[in-house]
Amino acid sequence: MIISVFTEKYKSIQRKLINSAVVESNGNTVQAIAQWDTGATGTCISKKIVSQLGLQPTGMIRVQTPSGIGIMNKYMINLILNNEVRIMNLVVMDSKIGNQGIDVLIGMDIISIGDFAVSNFEGRTQFSFRIPSQGHVEYHR
């Protein structure tokens, strides 16, 4: 079994979990900034990424966001996180997330295929992600 893992470390407490990513499609790649969001059920990409890769929709999907219900385009991509974790044939939707300065919003569709842990020990945030899941994380006194 191949285990893919990375840990992102910050020098201070972070309220946004950000890391580098590469979006691939049809042999083309784009460097991207990804933000992790446990409140998002699905992964989204910015309209800028759609344009840069010349992506064509594979269909439409009805989604509910904090700002309402909408219909969005679906796309098929490969996603590489921190040059370590590769997720192939990922169905994503486009979104206006580029307004937030990010290119990819990582949702629970990705988080749920592995183990995801966040720590803020000694005033420094770090988070780790690995696939496939290797076990539960439990905290004890």
Label each residue range with its predicted role:
Residues 1-141:
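Pepsin/retropepsin-fold aspartyl endopeptidases
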